[in-house]
Amino acid sequence: MAPTVDIKNLIYPWLIEAEEYSFNDINDGIRLHLNESPFPPPDFIIEEVKKYLHLGNRYQHPSLLERLRELMAEYNRVEPKNIYPTPGGDGALRAVFYNLIQTGDKVVINNPSYSMYKVYASVRGLKLTRVNLIENDNWWKMNFEKFLDEAKNARLVIIDDPNNPTGSPMLKAEEDKVRALAESINGFILIDEAYYEFSGYTVAKLINKYPNLLIVRTLSKAFSLASYRVGYLIGNEEVIKNLMKGATPFDISLPGYIAGITALENPSYVRKIVEEITKNREYLLNGLRKLGLKVYNSLTNFVFVKDERDLLSPLLNKGVAIRKPIIGYYRISVGTKEQVDTLLKYLGEIIENGNSK
């Protein structure tokens, strides 16, 4: 007879208590809840990927990794040795959480911020400190002095810039603030620039000046490659070299490599996507404000709305998904002009009919 084992006793308590990433999804309808691009990848990427689908029985050749690093470095005006390609931006976050910090270490983030920071911290058994953002008219801003004070005994600080879910700039690549953090912390500074293509600012030029500075990037948003799972870390050569030792073999799929390489060889299409989404974002902002909703300015592909009513459920019933990251606030991804019009129409009906009470 097999010995009786309470399996929970074999699992670390912090993993049992860890939080999960959760959201409401829809199979059909208008998806404005995951900050995806509403535009599919251009045909030239799809056609290039198709050429390699018959090689599904083979692992990826190392030359693909080398080429992707070269292109990512060129795109960011750094060296390939400063680039670590990962399966999406979340792969970059995982690399940091699982290799540069250990159970019991302190991590400091803004509140609110990207929800996966909290998930990774709880799964790893880390001490998480959250510093509340400050509402500033139609924007949100960091409480930088408090954040800096908390950073002094932290192993890792993470700043998503622009911030998710508020869409507001945080450090805005101001070197004085980066320097202050770099000099205060006995650990790493991780700047999550997932929305760099929309904000236009970056701290990439500072990685050699501040060797404990790391940057997360993704091709999921402006490049329209979310399901291909291509992201990367930018950092000091020594940090990147050692992080890559922990990479699993072939962790980016062959279609991901081909899509990423083809996109970065032809990046001009991204500018058109960013321009269209930016135009639609301003259209969405104005439309929401005309409905009487409190909505904040944004430097991303989403907007942040303050409202105590239940807007989530009635919109889901109409086939439109948005996100409610915290109580009393909604995050709405920017869609096509047609999707924005549909959303505004439904929201107007919901508010007028009082179904959101």
Curated annotation (Swiss-Prot):
Q: So what does this thing catalyse?
A: L-histidinol phosphate + 2-oxoglutarate = 3-(imidazol-4-yl)-2-oxopropyl phosphate + L-glutamate
Please state the pathway this protein functions in, per its UniProt record: Amino-acid biosynthesis; L-histidine biosynthesis; L-histidine from 5-phospho-alpha-D-ribose 1-diphosphate: step 7/9
Q: Name its co-factor(s).
A: pyridoxal 5'-phosphate
Keywords (alphabetical) are:
Amino-acid biosynthesis, Aminotransferase, Histidine biosynthesis, Pyridoxal phosphate, Transferase
Q: Which Pfam families match?
A: Aminotran_1_2
- Positions of post-translational N6-(pyridoxal phosphate)lysine modification: K221
* Source taxon at top rank: Archaea
Q: Name one GO molecular function term.
A: histidinol-phosphate transaminase activity
UniProt xrefs under PANTHER family: HISTIDINOL-PHOSPHATE AMINOTRANSFERASE (PTHR42885:SF2), HISTIDINOL-PHOSPHATE AMINOTRANSFERASE-RELATED (PTHR42885)
Name this polypeptide is given? Histidinol-phosphate aminotransferase
Task: Please report the organism this UniProt entry assigns to the protein.
Answer: Sulfurisphaera tokodaii (strain DSM 16993 / JCM 10545 / NBRC 100140 / 7)
Gene responsible for this protein: hisC
